[in-house]
Amino acid sequence: MIQMAQATTGSESRRDSSNVVVETRNLSKVYRDFWGRSKKTALKPLDLDVRRGEIFGLLGPNGAGKTTTLKLLLGLIFPTSGEALVFGRAATDVSKNERIGYLPEESYLYKFLDAEETLDFYGRLFGLDPDERRRRAAALIEMVGLTRDRKRQLREYSKGMTRRIGVAQALINDPELVILDEPTSGLDPIGTREMKDLIIDLKSRGKTVIMCSHLLADVEDVCDRIAVLHQGELKELGRVEDLLRVTGVTQIQATGLSPAAAAEVKAVLERHGAGDIDIGNPRTTLEDLFLEVVRDTDCLLYTSPSPRDQRG
């Protein structure tokens, strides 16, 4: 396989507005003190759109403005300037929220309810009838891997288990748009992988997902496009593969290449003036290594091939 890098820019042309689920224009947020003076600029003027059926990542360090952006989209706080539209409606229009599922960074759930009671409660808030609540609760509990713990009170749950039931409550209304703030927080590597698989599955079901994270691997693995925020300002916007592509570098990948053949390939490249030639085995990631070890001990069924299986 030969991959030729091409120069790209972080900005992209807008698509048909009918395909846009979320749109912000010059959206900003400044927190002020008691006297109305500017205290902190949490978000500088932001222009972006999220397209139907994609997984969109908001990436940035702590304090970059990611959670502020999500709260503005949900209408939980009001912008200082600009506008945010969700499904073509103003973000401050609460009627849009019936089509949204939201997992906050910290899940504030009733700790004396069990998983079934929790989902029944949120189902009531959306006006679901009893049979539909039971059906959806059972399916979601199985989806997030809490079937064995469905009768335990949430106060007995670990943080990872709490995140799982939090995702389930975000899906109880079968939303079109799912907003996840740090969805892998508190999860071990196995739980993280399962959470990322769940997010990808949501896309396959036709959902639009906005995922907020400061973990690079999480965003790289699941997102179609990303926006990189830093100190409240949009720094990059585009498709993941475009932003990660290194220009001016050609990558050649082959299996079953003998040392002699590798040396011959290197000699050909040198004759054509190639510089900084590196021919060797590709590296796997720590996550893949860990998951493979667990899989080999029958603790995890992981069907996709590991990069380590392709080593020469």
Language model segments and positions:
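A short, flexible loop at the N-terminus of ABC-type nucleotide-binding domains that lies
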Residues: 14-21, 30-45, 52
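Conserved ABC ATPase "signature" region
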Residues: 27, 120, 124, 131-149
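Conserved ABC transporter NBD signature motif
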Residues: 82-98
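ABC ATPase "signature
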Residues: 237-238
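Conserved small/polar residues in nucleotide/adenosyl-binding loops
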Residues: 302-307
